[in-house]
């Protein structure tokens, strides 16, 4: 399953995570975000222990979106050891999402 992250737990759940974390920046009104949500849930389950998938609602956390320069959604950011390691903008099929996550993690 994916983890909901906001300003209060971004530091602990993402930046201080021992495993790589993919952060999905999304919003309720974003069709493509809703399209990839089930795929991200499946990938989170399939890759449990290897990678964590977190979700940030940009309407509730505009400062996090601004901090990482997120201008369009969905945007996926991969963090490793507290550093931004890779990013992917836009929706994609599950296979492509999984390949990107595996390659980046």
Swiss-Prot record:
Keywords: Disulfide bond, Electron transport, Redox-active center, Transport. Residues 1-105 form the Thioredoxin domain. GO terms for molecular function: protein-disulfide reductase activity. Disulfide bonds join 30-33. The keyword 4Fe-4S does not apply. It comes from the Bacteria. Pfam families: Thioredoxin (PF00085). GO terms for cellular component: cytoplasm. Gene3D superfamilies: Glutaredoxin. Participates in various redox reactions through the reversible oxidation of its active center dithiol to a disulfide and catalyzes dithiol-disulfide exchange reactions. Belongs to the thioredoxin family. PANTHER family: GEO12009P1 (PTHR45663:SF11). This is Thioredoxin C-1. It comes from Corynebacterium nephridii.
